[in-house]
Amino acid sequence: GTVVGFTHLLNDSTYGGITVTPGDLSTTTDGNGMFRFDEAPVGSATVQAQHDGYTTGLRYVEVYEAQTTTTQMALMATQTWTFTADDGGTVALSEWTSSGYATTLSIDFPPSAVVHEDGSAYSGTVYVTVAMIDDPSELEAAPGDMSAVDTEDPAATVPLESFGMFTADLTTSEGEPLELSTAVDIWFPAYGSHEPGDSIGLYTFDEDTGLWVNEGTGTIDGDGNFVASVSHFTWWNCDQPVTNTSCLQGVATGDDGTPITGGHVRAVGIDYMGGGYGDIAPDGTFCVDVKPESENTIKLVAQSDNTIWTGETTGTGGLA
């Protein structure tokens, strides 16, 4: 089968030179951020996009014989902090606001909380590589498609609305992975409107399935921060399931008005951190499930005949 896609670096004009790997295949994006694999194995595939100093893009696709599968993703810049394992330390990301610098993520590591993967003690320098998604414009860099295992029915999935998510990796100076020996406290300002004491789901990303999995809850404190404890590091997400959705409909056409087929569209929320995916039908129509009455950016990647199309517009979800 064929896999075609588009990727780029958030807040950067770089589109070319990003390494993309579905399985054992590998290529780099062209100057427009496009990539293509004409002999991808049929079946489920994990498409990774990597670039030094950025998060890893992760999408999960199905590849079919003699058909084209499309996908899209973005990568987000990471920051690296250090502290001595014996002493512990605090990682605190911040950004400039109209009121000065504000903390966007805090992770508190107690002394001796970081160990080797086999559980043995580690006393050296810990390198913490982190990235924080706290705005809808950054959601393209989130792994997967914002689907989670339904807590009511583990065989089903449910879309999520996020209020902030982050990823963290712990390594030695040589790049050896490190682990936590105890839970650590994290907090970050929750996106949206919340009340002190609100309990919100805490989800972690399962790279094997491409789904978010609920691992407990966190609480909104008096300053509007989401506060929780985590026992390991991967992507962590503060979410609530979207139980009611609305079909955002449209028609994908080329420059001459001819319907585009063989692709998909992705809706990314403008006024909320969520969205969805939808396939483009043979007549060019599509339907993407989104939060009712929400504003969304619609991004398209498709192949029609020998032409690869990309496009972007906006749309509003209907009533529930």
Where are these regions (language model features)?
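Short flexible loop/turn segments that cap and initiate beta-strands
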Residues: 13-23, 119-126, 181-183, 198-199, ...
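Proteolytic cleavage junctions
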Residues: 1-3, 31, 52, 59, ...
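Predominantly extracellular/luminal regions of secreted and cell-surface proteins
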Residues: 104-152
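Predominantly extracellular/luminal cell-surface or secreted proteins
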Residues: 8, 23, 131, 203-205, ...
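A short, solvent-exposed loop/turn motif at the edges and junctions
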Residues: 22, 42-66, 74-76, 291-319
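Periplasm-facing N-terminal accessory domains of Gram-negative outer-membrane beta-barrel systems
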Residues: 3-40, 46-50, 60, 70-71
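Short, mixed charged/polar active-site loops
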Residues: 26, 56, 102-106, 273-275, ...
